[in-house]
Every structure is written in C-alpha cells, then in structure tokens.
A protein has these predicted regions:
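Active-site-flanking beta-strand signature of metal-NTP-handling nucleotidyl enzymes
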Residues: 1-9, 50-52
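Acidic/histidine-enriched, glycine/proline-rich intrinsically disordered or flexible terminal extensions
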Residues: 93-108
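Short, charged/polar surface micro-motifs in flexible loops or helix N-caps
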Residues: 12-13, 46-47, 56-61
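Short, surface-exposed ligand-recognition loops at beta-strand->loop->(often short) alpha-helix junctions
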Residues: 9-20
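Short, surface-exposed coil-to-beta transition loops
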Residues: 36, 47-50
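An amphipathic, aromatic/His-enriched active-site/gating alpha helix that lines ligand/cofactor pockets
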Residues: 24-38, 54-92, 107
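A short beta-turn/loop motif at secondary-structure boundaries
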Residues: 40-46
Length: 108
C-alpha cells in the first residue's frame, strides 16, 4: 500500500467548506487508485490542512502511469484552489512498511 500525504495552510479568510467545494474533482477517473482520502484540520491550528490518500494495490512503479491519467484533472483542481491555500509544505508518496494496532500487544 502507498500513502500520499499533503500538508498546506488555508489562506486568511478561507474556511474548509469553501476550500472543499473548489477541491472536489470535476471528473472521476475509473480505476483511480486513491480509494480513500482523509482531510483533517489541525486541532491547535484550524488553518493547517493535512490530506492523506490511501492507495491500495499499487506499486511505486505504477505512479507514472496513473499520474499521466490524473494530471489534467489535478491541474484543473489546482487552478481552482491555488488562491485558497498556500503551496504544500509536504507533498509526497510513501510506501507502507508496517501497520500496527497500538491497542493490542505487538509482536515482532
């Protein structure tokens, strides 16, 4: 599994509802690997927005192929949101190497 993470700040005077309306994709791509996307606001700083996308059943080698399909949609989305948020301070894709339930004993 891969995880895409993005951190940015809502601009002064912009609330999350306004951002979300502009952020929603204007086109759905069948087979988009980002099947679960979580957006969260920092509880201590509600202008700090963190977005995580879970990308299941994907290999890092697949990134160029699906980015080629998604780029036109993402470019349009960027044009809609760029005046609402700062440039990302984090924008990366990570490969999951462990998954743990910290409410249970963990065995090596």
């Amino acid at each position: 599994m891969l995880i895409a993470a993005l951190s940015r700040r809502l601009n002064d005077g912009v609330d999350y509802a306004t951002f979300r309306k502009a952020w929603l994709p204007d086109e759905i791509v069948p087979g988009d690997p980002r099947t679960k996307v979580f957006s969260a606001l920092n509880v201590e700083d509600p202008r700090e927005l963190f977005t995580v996308a879970l990308i299941e059943n994907a290999d890092p080698a697949d990134i160029p192929a699906w980015m080629a399909r998604l780029t036109p949609i993402e470019e349009r989305r960027y044009e809609r949101i760029r005046h609402l948020v700062s440039e990302p301070t984090l924008n990366a894709v990570y490969q999951v190497i462990a998954e743990d339930d910290l409410s249970q004993p963990i065995t090596e």
